[in-house]
């Protein structure tokens, strides 16, 4: 009797934790609002120089974006709502890192690779800014 009860409690705790997990899209929206709200505070130190990618395809410049974020975080007074902003940005970085881990998952047949390549090129042709 104890084991089924423990399993039920464990299952209930897992369902509750999943239900409370905030979707990443909500975190991104909240972060955009916080970024707009605290922009003056974040730009108050005019001597800080941050790497700004010249490439318009943001997907290719994630490393540089988060490098600049770390510099900004270290140069900004901590506490309050700004702390929440940096926590959200940290969550977004962790999410992106987890997604990047899926890039080399398994080997497949040539047809499946070509299907993936075709989908990738389709996204590239519609969503990326093409430079001369």
Curated annotation (Swiss-Prot):
The gene is IL5. Belongs to the IL-5 family. Pfam families: IL5 (PF02025). Homodimeric cytokine expressed predominantly by T-lymphocytes and NK cells that plays an important role in the survival, differentiation, and chemotaxis of eosinophils. Also acts on activated and resting B-cells to induce immunoglobulin production, growth, and differentiation. Mechanistically, exerts its biological effects through a receptor composed of IL5RA subunit and the cytokine receptor common subunit beta/CSF2RB. It is found in: Secreted. This is Interleukin-5. Residues 1-17 form the signal peptide. GO terms for cellular component: extracellular space. The lineage of its organism: Eukaryota, Metazoa, Chordata, Craniata, Vertebrata. GO terms for biological process: immune response. Keywords: Cytokine, Disulfide bond, Glycoprotein, Growth factor, Secreted, Signal. Homodimer; disulfide-linked. Interacts with IL5RA. Interacts with CSF2RB. Glycans are attached at residues 45, 74, 88. One of its GO terms (molecular function) is growth factor activity.
